[in-house]
Amino acid sequence: MSTARKHTALPKAQILIEALPWLTRHHGRTVVIKFGGNAMIDEELKAAFAQDVVFLRHAGLKPVVVHGGGPQISAQLDKQGLVSEFKAGLRVTTPEAMDVVRMVLAGQVQRELVGLLNQHGPLAVGLTGEDAHTITAVQHRPTIDGELVDIGRVGEITAIDTGAIQALLDDGRIPVVSSIARSADDHHVYNVNADTAAAALAAALNAETLMVLTDVEGLYEDWPNSDDVISRLTASQLEKLLPELSSGMVPKMQGCLHAVRNGVETARVIDGRVQHSILLEIFTDEGIGTMVVPDAPIDVHAARTAHEQGAS
């Protein structure tokens, strides 16, 4: 009987051993995860996400969660009879709408996420970009048809202070950050794109990895003509593709580009509709999304030698 039980358990042991190189590689490193898409509104996906993040923490990584809340914000605006309008892919945010954004992000979405994480122990602590000047912003004015357009309380990040987040990480906590920020100029509170905020925080924290959860499998090679996913590309390759991307993917991929060009080793866009997608991406060879890596460093000596040989 005991021998049979041992054999039954062997596959589990094999799975754990296969994860060993990845555990060794990522131990002690910071991972910034942008939580969004369908994973925010599906109860099973939310629970699986919380399990993944807590697993990372107990496996020796330092996860930081950044979230938005588009669907929840839209629902609350509709409930209060406030018109939700978009320009240049960004929500026009009046002062009244900003009150709703702030309430939903910090008072609803963040609280639910912190609660899910803390079902596994006293780990998660919620904060917003306002707290301890974590994120500072100015009003963002996009150019539409050649003219600057006022879209209200939409912010563009100008500074990141990682002190509060780093203190939480050092204490073994999981920071959960709502993507709103205060301006040092007019002291207004601004709605900041969560993809952009996650990328800026990843760079400022010198994170190993930025992970962005989406409602697609990754970056498609030739959408809509093909559903083949690009598994890996460099910063320069991504930069060339940006003008061709759909509007919803642009801030995500711009965030990935910013991250890997500012010290982050990898940025990954993964399918948040797949349960435990974070663990699959980090602890297996079979990554399930698109990984962006920095351009290879230029070998100055080799380039100079080649130039001299060509000149001779």
Swiss-Prot record:
InterPro entries: AceGlu_kinase-like_sf, AcgluKinase_fam, ArgB, Asp/Glu/Uridylate_kinase, Glu/AcGlu_kinase, NAGK-C. Substrate binds at residues 69-70, 91, 191. It is found in: Cytoplasm. It is an enzyme of class 2 (transferase). It catalyses: N-acetyl-L-glutamate + ATP = N-acetyl-L-glutamyl 5-phosphate + ADP. GO terms for biological process: arginine biosynthetic process via ornithine; L-arginine biosynthetic process. Keywords: Amino-acid biosynthesis, Arginine biosynthesis, ATP-binding, Cytoplasm, Kinase, Nucleotide-binding, Transferase. Its main location: cytoplasm. It holds the Pfam family AA_kinase. One of its GO terms (cellular component) is cytoplasm. Pathway: Amino-acid biosynthesis; L-arginine biosynthesis; N(2)-acetyl-L-ornithine from L-glutamate: step 2/4. The keyword Amino-acid biosynthesis applies. PANTHER family: N-ACETYLGLUTAMATE SYNTHASE (PTHR23342), N-ACETYLGLUTAMATE SYNTHASE, MITOCHONDRIAL (PTHR23342:SF0). Catalyzes the ATP-dependent phosphorylation of N-acetyl-L-glutamate. This is Acetylglutamate kinase. It comes from Streptomyces griseus subsp. griseus (strain JCM 4626 / CBS 651.72 / NBRC 13350 / KCC S-0626 / ISP 5235). The lineage of its organism: Bacteria, Bacillati, Actinomycetota, Actinomycetes, Kitasatosporales.
